[in-house]
Amino acid sequence: MNYGKEQVAVYRTYANPLEGVRTIPESSFDGRDNILFGLEVRVQFEGEEFLPSFSEADNTTVVATDSMKNFVLHQAGEYEGATAEGFLHFVGTEFLETYPHVEAVTMSATEYPFDERPVPGDDGFDPSDLVFRVSDDESAFGEIYLEREGDELRFEEQTSGVTEIELVKVKENSFTGYVQDEYTTLPEREDRALYISLDVFWTYSDPEDALGDEPQRYVPAEQVRDIAQVVFHEVNSNSIQDLIYQIGLRVLERYPQLESVNFEANNRTWIEVRDDLDGDAKVLREPPRPTGYQQFSMDRSDLEEQ
């Protein structure tokens, strides 16, 4: 039994910057200014006190979802951290402290991506600190679950992620050796272009690390995105399953503070129309529906087996 508010768009200018994150070989990302910090937030309340609103049309204990929206918007001005997960934890804690009859709250959000825009400077072009482009690129994701236990609040569940990574590798991918029977019409490919859409999610051994209070232990979505594209560049994979497994191993290797990593992938590979051109040139077209997908979960035991 739960209810809540979703698609709460909130924007904060000049939030505190994310600084001091640990750098990795696959990424140049070392922090962000957070001059423009935007989230689409979802709030979910749980509690037995809400049962009469369902069974008896008694709204005595109901916090209107419009009030939830206003609460989130107000707290965006109070939050002093630098991460989506930290904001969600902050707001969730404030909800539980404000409404003692709420037993648990799930807070989730997708971060709106904004790109810095180059403007002329003294020595060429520099990123503007005033103008940003609203981007259609991948987005960071966060979810936290807080519950009441007596007089204490427990925080033991979280998920972080980066969604809608879209990558195309023009060659050095294959797909061979799969089941061949009377239903098979797909030809094997020793070398093909590969187009994938990828969502990556991860959990920490200690959920507190997700909040960003200790930046060295925080895993930025930008770095995980960069790991995915670097591994895609390096690996000649024989399937998307093989590719996401290699990405997962690299993520777990780079971040010993993580407990697990999960994938949802979609195959959007273009179909070859002509391969009789010079060199590696090909003509391709959009694939027809339906499309293939893959889901996979890994934890530290997978890394230890390597």
Swiss-Prot record:
Gene Ontology molecular functions: urate oxidase activity
Positions of the UniProt region annotated as Disordered: 281-306
Keyword Oxidoreductase found: yes
Catalytic activity: urate + O2 + H2O = 5-hydroxyisourate + H2O2
Gene3D superfamilies cross-referenced by the UniProt entry: Urate Oxidase
GO process terms (BP): purine nucleobase catabolic process; urate catabolic process
Assigned EC number: 1.7.3.3
Keyword terms: Oxidoreductase, Plasmid, Purine metabolism
UniProt-annotated catalytic positions: K5, T65
Domain of life: Archaea
Sequence positions that bind urate: T65, D66, F175, R192, I240, Q241, N267
Metabolic or biological pathway, per its Swiss-Prot or TrEMBL entry: Purine metabolism; urate degradation; (S)-allantoin from urate: step 1/3
Disulfide bonds: none
UniProt similarity note: Belongs to the uricase family.
Functional description taken from the UniProt entry: Catalyzes the oxidation of uric acid to 5-hydroxyisourate, which is further processed to form (S)-allantoin.
Name this protein carries in UniProt: Uricase
Species for this entry: Halalkalicoccus jeotgali (strain DSM 18796 / CECT 7217 / JCM 14584 / KCTC 4019 / B3)
